[in-house]
């Protein structure tokens, strides 16, 4: 047995997996022109060039949706543009004498260096001297002569600056668990250093000695700090200065004591600062010691009044050149002493007298350091980074060492050093560009040290203020030309701008710190003024370049379009890049400032130009104005899309008004150009798929692209006036509908002139055309929905305007109709084959199996659907399936009508065929839905097959059942009949009372009728002995009242049979001819009072009337009649004869 019955159409199963179609709107396949269209006006009627120009307009607007992101705008990491430099803005040029004096100062610093070098410093004297020779550019002879002069000069006088800051974790000496510490400190000459005889206990020097010590105290100018009561972590922050005789041998000695007596050595030592000279100080100190001992209670051999807490011995030569700022661990006087804790000291070795010309002439160390740093910085920049603007001032080892030595010897504070490096570097930056990060770091150093020291000599503060003013003036000049020196698309330049703004921010922070303010006004106001001036200069230059005012209006228009585009792009950059920098750093609203200024300027130009060009309106002018308006509208919307900002107060508000005539003219041309474009696309279309992945041809892609471009253009247009937008949108939607229908008409004409290949059952060209129609239907629907315009305050958000919705629905219906027409044309080529296979099933002998009879049809359908699946998109495949399904049902119905008096196997075979086709077309859910398959003609065919299998009486019963079903479906068109019916069980009779009728059809010429009612029971074989009865005729009325009662002697069981009913037929009595049929109604007997069983509901009370709607027999009622017509039995023929007579009456009425 064949297995074709199990075929579920593998083709149909794949339908759900395949995409409907793939729109290729990136480019039009048939357009291969690689050249961009000219920027001038397009030629009238040249659709390709027009839409190419429109694509450029749309492409220009692609980047204008929403607010820009900085990461999108920053596109280049190339070096930043070079900033302007001016050699005259640096420090003044020194005279030759001043250079020689500075050279001598630097050599003197190196030759008389003292202290310990750091790990990054150079301790080689020859290297340092050679470095200075290179910095000053002297010859070897001049260099040696200068060295000899410096060596003959007196050595400098050294001094040690000591800051006793704090101590921690000291030993507790008092009963309360604390101590009352104070410090005694002084300089120990080399001759006073303690000697340690071999074999004796280790003994360190101390400012106190036991009773056995008789030598004078060796310390010079002993200083003492205040006593800090009850603490183990004292804080002093006291500063002292000690002269140094020999930096190589002298030591700093410091003792920490616990103060216990009212009169102690500490109090006496405070007066030692008044003693001048070591000899006098020693004698005085000895007297103080004796006095303290005499007043104490301890014995001569006991410890002294103040308890020892620790000491420090620091050789002067070990003090770093840059100074020391650290914690020192306290040491005991001897190995037997018990001490703990640390002491924080700040040490710096300086010179107090220098035998140099600059010192002799009163030039301060501040000035000499400034000049030396400037010299070194210029030399290092020239050597290290001759052509770079990213140099961060990294000095070489010798350069750092020389400056460190000079700064320390000149006793410059950290604040002074920070100020000097800023002054020199900021001035040098204006002559040769440095890295702004380096300058920002210098400002941060100044700020940090300023907060600590908070003061400078007035002269130095004024010098710092001058450097701030010079740098701010330089920065403002750069900000005026912001777009030139810091282009927003260059990430390197933007980063330099960010650092420059941070430098200016630091300058702002210094304003309240100066007694003499370096700025006449607030720096932020100066910055805003510089930005405004820069905006105006940039705009004027751009206007003179792109659209000079002396040119005629039409020539200026193209330039103004370009200018407006540049301004929009500039505003994007301002918002996406510059705005956050200026607002976040300086609190300057750069974007608002720039937008309002540029928007006002470009609006003024646009108003003037539109007034000039309005009388000269033509296609070229309209094109230019249309493009100009789009950019201006984008500019206005760009402002309004920023939260909290409205565009009503802008100069561009209302700018759409003068552009309306140009926009209308341009949209009119768009309609004509669209048709030309579609015509050209269809002319060159070969009605073949674009590629293997697509099922539509090139013209459909072009049509879809055109519709999409029109919709995108409308979105770009976004006309602000609701009433005007409705008119423009309505016209544009009608133009799009017209273009879509125009395209389908062109396709139909092309198919008519290019028929498919001879003998081809399924035309590939028709499949492509069908796919084209579907693609355009979807594209047009999507494009039209995108045309939704605002209806003002009365419009609902998200609801399409009514005119647009009507247009969309009408076009969709038209394109659906066109698709069904093409589908019918496509399936008509299969009609002959389908009829042949249906006839094969009809003529198959009863001896073969049903599936064998159906096999050829299923195989044919499977092959054709495989071809259709490859050629059609899913939507069109479904259309073809539906058409084929209807075609098959009609073919089977025709086969059934053509065969009479056939065997039951014949109808069984077609019943099998119908179910096999349902399974085939459903394809396990991948094909047509079952509810669609089992509807319409399927029901009619299934009923035909069922009736053909029924007996004559079953067909008659079905006839009456159909009448009963018809009652509830018919509307009140033919009037109403009210009756009352019940069964009298005692007499075994049925009582039927005809009460009255209403709203009957007027069947006579006078507009009335002469109605009477025929009452009969059916089906006849259930009531063979019962004759029909009739009421009296009621003349000239449409609302007769009968009130007549009829009895029918019938058993109750007969009334309960299937199809048992009372049939009321209303006739119009005609005296001269055949009576006319007015309507009929049927009432089932199974539910009337006396017949209905208790579980059915108890029936109806005898007195309850029933109103029946009159109707005429419908098609499903006549199907049973047609079935009976083919029967040859007497019962069937008599029944049909009776009904035929009734139908004649009905036809006469029509």
UniProtKB/Swiss-Prot annotation:
Binding site for Ca(2+) 3: 1003-1004, 1068, 1070, 1076
Subcellular location: Cytoplasm, Cytosol; Recycling endosome membrane; Late endosome membrane; Golgi apparatus, trans-Golgi network membrane
UniProt entry keywords in alphabetical sequence: Calcium, Cell membrane, Cytoplasm, Endosome, Exocytosis, Golgi apparatus, Membrane, Metal-binding, Repeat, Transport
Chain's role: Functions in endosome to Golgi retrograde transport. In response to calcium influx, may interact with SNARE fusion receptors and membrane phospholipids to mediate endosome fusion with the trans-Golgi network. By promoting the recycling of secretory vesicle transmembrane proteins, it indirectly controls dense-core secretory vesicle biogenesis, maturation and their ability to mediate the constitutive and regulated secretion of neurotransmitters and hormones.
Protein's name in the database: BAI1-associated protein 3
GO cellular component terms given for this protein: cytosol; GABA-ergic synapse; late endosome membrane; plasma membrane; presynapse; recycling endosome membrane; trans-Golgi network membrane
Residues engaged in binding Ca(2+) 4: 1070, 1073, 1076
Gene: Baiap3
Organism lineage string: Eukaryota, Metazoa, Chordata, Craniata, Vertebrata
Tissue and organ distribution: Prominently expressed in brain structures including hypothalamus, amygdala, stria terminalis and periaqueductal gray (at protein level). Expressed in nonneuronal tissues, including placenta, lung, pancreas, spleen, and testes. Within placenta, expression is restricted to the syncytiotrophoblasts.
